[in-house]
Each structure stands twice: as C-alpha cells, then as structure tokens.
Amino acid sequence: LRSNPTVDCTAAVAQDQSCTVSIKIHAQVSPSDSPRKDEVIIRGVAIQSLQNLAWDVNFYTRNTFSRANMDADSFLDYVAFTAANGKQDSPTAGTGDQYKYQARGLDIRYRDMSATEEITTTSQVHFSIVNRSTTVKSEGADGAIVVILAVEPIE
C-alpha cells in the first residue's frame, strides 16, 4: 500500500506536528471478497522523503482520533525512525536524492474499525506522520514524502 506524495502530507510540518493519511486496503491487498477485507497484518513500513528527518508513523483503528481525549483516541501502534535511519542511494548524493527508511519484521494486526462500524467496503489504514526533527518538513514538492506499507491479508 502506498501513499500519494502529490496529495498526502503536502503542507509544512513543524517539530512534533503531524499530518494524517488514509490508504485504501480493499482491492490493493486481495482481489477476492474476503470476509475480513477490513483486516491486515502490517509487516513493514518504508518511507521515501526528500528531507532527512526523524519520523514517527502512528497507526489508528478509526478515521477519527483525538490527542486531547483518550477515550476517543483509537491509537494502535507506531514505528519510529531517526534521521540516522535515512539512507540515500548514492554515496555522493546531492540535492533531490531521496532518503529511504525501512522497518521490517513487524506484526501489527490492523482492523479498520471505521469500516466495520459504518458497514462499508472502503477499508483503509489510518495513520499519521509525525516530524520529530527540529527542522520543519518543507511544503509541496520540496517536502515530498511517501509511506509504503507491506501488509498481509487475513483470510
């Protein structure tokens, strides 16, 4: 599953601020109509970013979540990346080369409770991307970021 860098998280993001993203599960994971089309296991998280920043990817089970109200917060799990985790393809990388981050071997059982409660076929993985660096994530194309999720369907 892959976020869209021209649509998702395009604004500037200051330290400890976040942007939210939802990626559709159904039809990307399994072409069949599985009875559990709203449920996957997240096995890996990768980030492509034009800026070398520290990132957290926080997963939520609903499309509504609140930092102010713990009863309404549907937080499930998170994956943290430091700036040192960011690797470039070229040892002599220059402007415009991407930083790539990766976490494998995860076992995050994810169920879209919004889809379950709303009885919809549009299941999504809901997450936020949090900038943990003192440097502001740039807006627009200069701050492009993509989150890629490796998921396994639960049949």
Task: State where each predicted segment sits.
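C-terminal interaction-tip segments
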Residues: 1-15, 34, 117-155
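Intrinsically disordered, low-complexity segments enriched in Ser/Pro/Gly/Ala and basic residues
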Residues: 2, 17, 21, 29, ...
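Short, surface-exposed beta-strand/loop "edge" segments at domain boundaries and coil↔beta transitions
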Residues: 14, 54-55, 65-69, 110, ...
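Surface-exposed turn/loop modules enriched in turn-prone residues
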Residues: 50-85
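Extended, solvent-exposed segments with strong compositional bias
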Residues: 73-117
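Beta-rich globular "head" domains
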Residues: 19-63, 146-152
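Hydrophobic side chains in beta-strands
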Residues: 47, 59, 81, 101, ...
